[in-house]
Amino acid sequence: MASASFVKPNTLSSPWIGQRSFAHTSASSSPPPRVSFAIRAGAYSDELVKTAKSIASPGRGILAIDESNATCGKRLASIGLDNTEDNRQAYRQLLLTTPGLGDYISGSILFEETLYQSTKDGKTFVDCLRDANIVPGIKVDKGLSPLAGSNEESWCQGLDGLASRSAEYYKQGARFAKWRTVVSVPCGPSALAVKEAAWGLARYAAISQDNGLVPIVEPEILLDGDHPIERTLEVAEKVWSEVFFYLAQNNVMFEGILLKPSMVTPGAEHKNKASPETVADFTLTMLKRRVPPAVPGIMFLSGGQSEAEATLNLNAMNQSPNPWHVSFSYARALQNSVLRTWQGKPEKIEASQKALLVRAKANSLAQLGKYSAEGENEDAKKGMFVKGYTY
């Protein structure tokens, strides 16, 4: 695995950099020798870069269906279905066998159960994705737990055993991974919570790359709160500054990662709603200040926005060139229409798959900066924010 992009060393403040000594010399001395950094190279370096670029391809984004079984059960309950493995399998089969999905979707994040499941005809879901030119991914974190010593904040579990699990996921066909941790603005956030989130993401990213998986780095800044957009920007800049500091400390190769940030918006309970142009301006300002251009792709989460809102905001961010591929990694903002259409009825599978393609195509156009909200139905404009949302 290769190391991250480097900041120019300050040779005046550090006598030792990269195991090289810098002696201060007089003006008449010959120029100091060039510094060479040892780059860690692993067997997966080229593959990681190739995978990341494949996912960050024009007009395509990520379909996230990595909800835990409990969360998937809530989705099924909303249409009157029991939370059984058969029902979860049927829903995932509906999504992953949608004809033409690969035209708009480049990667799909799966829950562990889904990675090992197959269609009723015996074809693995991994093969369904590969045949559609979609890269299979896997959620690897083990959820959130209260962070002792913090302001009622949380930390993300799952580092124990991650290396061996990642190796198994790679053998099963996964080529990228996702780790979701959260930051709450109303809770501070505390310096402890931000550092814990950043360090955990960095360790996960390094372990993933060592095992052939492109890590999606996701410190979700929750929509909870009544704060203005300026406060969200302040917190986002702090969080991403810490994240990239620790990614570099852990020798993570920036060219072999993808980011899954929250858009910079006001808190969900703020009195004023931001326009897509304002969201784009604040979000791109944050990214340009904190994210190196070596990163190939920014795959936004929807975070409880309505389907139409998430698409409009993404479209606004693609009205001018960006240093990175700016796209989507949506769950609810792609699936909500599908569930409403399906209702668990076999005769509605085709209509449900068409509903998925409508949303996928809309976001594909938004990635290209060509989306228009004309013709969007009222259901697509309904917000999906859930306070304290858990995956």
Curated annotation (Swiss-Prot):
EC class of the enzyme, as a word: lyase
Pfam families on file: Glycolytic (PF00274)
Post-translational modification note: Can be trimethylated at Lys-387 by LSMT-L, but the trimethylation has no effect in vitro.
Tissue: Expressed in roots, and at low levels in rosettes leaves, cauline leaves, stems and flowers.
PROSITE patterns: ALDOLASE_CLASS_I (PS00158)
Phosphoserine sites (modified residues): S150, S208
Record-listed substrate binding positions: R88, K178, S302, G303, G304
Active site: E218, K260
Keyword set, alphabetical order: Chloroplast, Glutathionylation, Glycolysis, Lyase, Methylation, Phosphoprotein, Plastid, Schiff base, Transit peptide
Catalytic reaction list: beta-D-fructose 1,6-bisphosphate = D-glyceraldehyde 3-phosphate + dihydroxyacetone phosphate
InterPro entries registered for this protein in UniProt: Aldolase_I_AS, Aldolase_TIM, FBA_I
CDD domains: FBP_aldolase_I_a
FT transit peptide: 1-40
Subunit structure comment from the entry: Homotetramer.
PANTHER family reported in the protein's UniProt record: FRUCTOSE-BISPHOSPHATE ALDOLASE (PTHR11627)
This protein's name: Fructose-bisphosphate aldolase 3, chloroplastic
Organism: Arabidopsis thaliana (Mouse-ear cress)
